[in-house]
A protein has these predicted regions:
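Glycine/Thr-rich beta-alpha phosphate-binding loop at enzyme active sites
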Residues: 36-45, 181-194, 228-282
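Glycine-rich phosphate-binding active-site loops on the catalytic face of alpha/beta enzymes
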Residues: 88-94, 178-180, 244-249, 298-325
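Active-site glycine- and acidic-residue-rich loops that bind
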Residues: 148-160, 188, 217-236
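A gly/proline- and charged-residue-enriched helix-loop-helix capping module
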Residues: 90-139
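C-terminal helical cap(s) of enzyme catalytic domains, especially alpha/beta-barrels
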Residues: 99-112, 252-262, 315-339
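Short beta-strand/loop segments at the ligand-binding rim of alpha/beta enzyme cores
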Residues: 58-64, 138-143, 208-223, 279-288
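Catalytic cores of alpha/beta
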Residues: 74-79, 223-235, 292-309
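Alpha-helix-loop-beta-strand connector modules within alpha/beta enzyme cores
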Residues: 113, 123-138, 191-212, 260-284, ...
């Protein structure tokens, strides 16, 4: 329905106007009794194989919506009803800011990409808090926070801390967005010292709270491999909970100023995720985002080491059905893996049983053969003699028999005492 009807209508509008229309329609559906239930019924896929527990938070599925779609937290409950496992709102800044002049967002349909130079447009901290106060039990909501454009880099830590403190009770996790906003031509180079100046006050504040809120750091694919390695090392040395990789890269000049998102980012985003995963030893959570346009892209990101996924441009081009497609693909992969594991275990058990039977048969055959050969060696066949027996008899000394005396030879044999004498008596002369 989205690809055949809704998408052509939305794509006939400018992307920013289409975005506002989509959010408005979602909010209207949310106001209708049973509206969010209907969306969940149509789009949500649930299965035990999809469930994840990452940085202490339980997710119904690993597919989330990236920051940048719902800047102010206006429709996060309706967006969650479209099947997302979690929603990340923002980027939120302490004070409202209008961003750059329009037009500032552009589609590249042939490349399935978007150029974005909005400039972190949002309605500020206070308005976001009003939206997050709405009941949202059971929903995982992350908050992407950043400094105001007019705030100098040396004062950035104060902006982040203000946002973190005031939103702490409303968000389930926080993403610290240190990327240069998309109004600039090149990404700002953040040193390790600068990053820690932003993060350390957040860690200090969190230590004094009763509830724990995970802190993620969002990185840009524009960063060199050396900088990405340094950020990965921060994971090992600080209480940072994980990395969101990646934001969009700055678009080439021939395309236009702004950040590029969509299919052209797929390969680089996977490379960054794999590098962070390898560098950190696979011991820290990674949210993979950037260029996920299909279930195959989602699988590649997870195989690279991502624990969770986020959609943005793929959601715009493919619609909410993409979430369900990815979830069903993950279920099929999990079931196939379980079946393969069961088959391998069954094969191993069969091999063990066959080996045991073969060994038992060999023992039985050996015992039977031994039992048959033993009597044959003890008793020779009638009428036959072994050579050894003949030699033994030949070597044995003959029994000495006394020579009979002449008298004994001439005298008749004497009957035994218990036998009658049957000899004839001779008459006396």
């Amino acid at each position: 329905m989205y690809r055949r009807i809704i998408k052509p209508i939305l794509f006939s509008l400018t992307i920013e106007r289409a975005h506002h229309v989509a959010l408005l329609l979602l909010r209207i559906i949310g106001l209708i009794p049973g509206g969010r239930w209907f969306l969940r019924k149509c789009y949500t896929v649930r299965h035990p194989a999809l469930e994840r527990e990452v940085f202490g938070v339980k997710f119904a599925n690993p597919v989330g919506l990236a920051a940048g779609f719902d800047h102010n937290g206006e429709a996060y409950r309706e967006l969650a009803a479209l099947g997302f496992g979690f929603i990340e709102i923002g980027t939120v800044t302490p004070r409202p800011q209008a961003g750059n002049p329009r037009p500032r967002v552009f589609r590249l349909p042939k490349d399935r990409a978007i150029i974005n130079r909005i400039g972190l447009s949002n309605r500020g901290l206070d308005k976001t808090i009003c939206h997050l106060r709405r009941p949202h039990e059971g929903l995982i909501v992350g908050c992407n926070i950043g400094k105001n454009t007019v705030t100098p880099p040396e004062n950035a830590a104060a902006d982040y801390l203000r946002l973190f403190r005031n939103l702490y009770q409303y968000a389930d996790y926080f993403t610290v967005n240190i990327s240069c906003d998309n109004s600039c031509r090149e990404g700002t180079t953040y040193t390790r010292t600068h990053i820690l100046q932003i993060l350390d006050p957040l860690f200090d504040f969190r230590r004094g709270q009763n509830q724990y809120r995970p802190i993620m750091l969002k990185v840009s694919p524009d960063m060199s491999d050396e900088v990405i390695d340094e950020i990965s090392d921060i994971l090992l040395e600080t209480p940072l909970d994980g990395i969101v990789a990646t934001n969009g890269p700055m678009a080439p000049d021939k395309i236009g100023r702004g950040r590029l998102s969509g299919a052209p980012l797929t390969q680089r985003a996977v490379e960054v995720v794999r590098r962070i995963h390898t560098r950190s030893g696979g011991n820290f959570p990674i949210i993979g985002v950037g260029g996920i346009m299909s279930p195959a892209d989602a699988k590649a990101m997870l195989d690279a080491g991502a624990d969770l996924l986020q959609l943005y441009t793929g959601y715009i081009y493919e619609g909410p059905g993409l979430v369900g497609e990815i979830c069903r693909s993950l279920i099929a992969d999990a079931e196939a893996a379980a079946a393969a594991k069961a088959a391998a275990e069954a094969k191993a058990r069969e091999e063990i049983r066959a080996a045991a039977e073969s060994e038992e048969a060999a023992k039985t055959a050996a015992a039977t053969q031994t039992g048959i050969q033993a009597p044959e060696t003890e008793k020779a066949a009638p009428g036959t003699e072994t050579a050894a027996t003949a030699q033994t008899q030949a070597a044995a000394p003959a029994e000495s028999v006394p020579n009979p005396s002449p008298e004994t030879q001439n005298s008749p044999a004497r009957p035994a005492d218990n036998e009658p004498d049957t000899r004839k008596k001779q008459p006396a002369s």
